[in-house]
A protein has these predicted regions:
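Dinucleotide-binding Rossmann-like beta1-alpha1 core, especially the glycine-rich loop
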Residues: 50-132, 159
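Glycine-rich FAD pyrophosphate-binding loop
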Residues: 24-49
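A conserved FAD-binding loop/helix module that cradles the flavin
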Residues: 412-435
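FAD-binding beta-loop-beta segment adjacent to the flavin cofactor pocket
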Residues: 321-327, 380-407, 411-414
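Mid-domain catalytic core of redox enzymes
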Residues: 2, 26, 225-332, 337-346, ...
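N-terminal Rossmann-like FAD-binding beta1-loop-alpha1 element of flavoenzymes
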Residues: 5-32
Length: 440
């Protein structure tokens, strides 16, 4: 019989790695199985031709996040954190607007003065809501229009919601937006501008530091190990199957997206429960990373409020982390959320770059194809869970039909939205639950 682990964890994103780290630190025998060829999940990194490292999908954290900095400190890597006031802006009606401070808002003449005031007061109205359940039955549009009117919604919010949630724009409940506004309102420093933090070389480096820490304490991590099914007896799981291996364990934790977990359990669990996992919808993301000779603008995070623009925004990473760290080149991310049924999902990398370029040149007329030194296109099928109205009523919890198997995944972080900070929080919480069971 092959050896039995105390805990077998599926997925080496931040939730899986955090749980593995906590448990192996306490002396449990842990094995992590990751389908991909690298750790970090959506926060994984890649290298350009000259070895410059970067994220596949951009991440930063806010100055009110607590779990990431705690972890960074514990791993002794505080020196790798870069913090800067963020420079955010908006592209609307063919021009750029700065939107980093209250004063910028007053200059936003695309809205009437009354509407600017309504937009400015929104943060205060939002803070008055203490119980998110009271707005869970509303769509984002219904809720925001009631607070700041149709014109503000149309100009400022609708293009962002549409580019973020694509075909699900009318389905997502208001809690998602409420959470975003409350959080962003609390991340400002004493001058009223927002502070953001980034990890040198990308969050994937932090994930790799966790791998080293897990291995130091005797834990194991196996890459290219896609779990295909489970072996169960009565109400207990005994083992997981991968293409090469059968892995036995006492406790099991599943951290991928619900549809992936549903496929793994398909033949072993009751259909009603498996279908409940499939009830949660997801959007995919295509992220284009451009390495450029020249800078596009001086804004880090440019929201594009132009109904014809197919990306949620232009994130010029080197307006946050200095170009010196990238051999004096400039890095821009273009992110698009879409249903995987969308024809754009099937574009080749080359088609996607051409598609992006025609839109970028409309915004930045000086930009030329010769600016692009290198590019990469990354695709994530389950990038954003869609939290529809009444989501808390149907989202599956951490339990499975098997007493020794648990789920902790991005779609359960609700009412918060996804993020590395919460992945770490959830990984710690589920590790506690599992440790308590092992100690019985």
């Amino acid at each position: 019989v092959s050896q039995q682990y105390d805990v077998v964890i599926v997925g080496a994103g931040f939730t899986g790695l955090t749980a593995a780290y906590q448990l192996s630190k306490q002396g449990y025998r842990v094995r992590v199985l990751e389908a991909d060829n690298a750790v970090g999940g959506l926060a994984g990194t890649f290298e350009f031709a000259d070895g410059v490292r970067l994220e596949k999908f951009y991440h930063h954290w806010f100055n009110n996040d607590i779990y990431v900095p705690e972890l960074v400190k514990e791993l002794g890597m505080e020196g790798d954190v870069i913090t800067l006031p963020s420079r955010t802006g908006m592209y609307f009606n063919g021009r750029m607007w700065k939107l980093s401070t209250p004063l910028d808002l007053l200059r936003f003449t695309a809205l009437s003065f009354v509407d600017r005031v309504r937009l400015g007061l929104l943060v205060f109205q939002v803070r008055r809501i203490k119980d998110w359940r009271s707005i869970e039955h509303l769509s984002i549009r219904q809720w925001l229009e009631s607070l700041c009117g149709q014109r503000v919604y149309k100009v400022v919010w609708e293009p962002l919601i549409r580019s973020k949630f694509s075909v699900y724009a009318e389905a997502v409940n208001a809690v998602w937006m409420w959470k975003k506004l409350v959080l962003r309102g609390s991340t400002r420093n004493d001058k009223g501008s927002e502070e953001l933090a980034y990890f040198k070389g990308g969050f994937g480096r932090l994930a790799e530091a966790m791998v080293s820490a897990i291995e130091k304490t005797g834990g194991e991590i196996t890459l290219d190990a896609k779990v295909t099914s489970v072996i169960a007896e009565a109400d207990e799981l005994k083992a997981l199957r991968t293409a090469r291996d059968t892995v036995h364990g006492k406790k099991f934790l599943f951290t991928p997206a619900f549809p992936i977990i549903a496929n793994i359990f398909e033949s072993a669990a009751n259909a009603e429960w498996v279908n409940s996992l499939r009830r949660v919808n997801y959007l995919g993301n295509m992220c284009l990373v451009l390495r450029l000779k020249h800078s596009l603008s001086d804004t880090y995070w440019l929201n594009v409020n132009d109904p014809g623009f197919p990306f949620v925004g232009v994130i010029e990473h080197t307006n946050f982390d200095t170009p010196e760290n990238y051999e004096r080149t400039h890095i821009a991310f273009l992110s698009r959320y879409l249903a995987v049924e969308d024809e754009v999902w099937g574009y080749s990398d080359e088609e996607y770059v051409n598609f992006a370029l025609q839109h970028l040149q409309r915004m930045f007329p000086d930009m030329d194809r010769s600016w692009i030194l290198e590019h990469r296109v990354w695709r994530a099928e389950y990038a954003q869970p869609v939290t529809e109205r009444g989501y808390s009523q149907y989202v599956p919890n951490e339990h499975t039909p098997f007493s020794n198997a648990f789920i902790s995944t991005m779609a359960q972080i609700y009412p918060e939205d996804r993020g590395t900070n919460y992945a770490i929080r959830e990984g710690r919480a589920i590790a506690k639950t599992i440790a308590a069971q092992l100690d019985k």
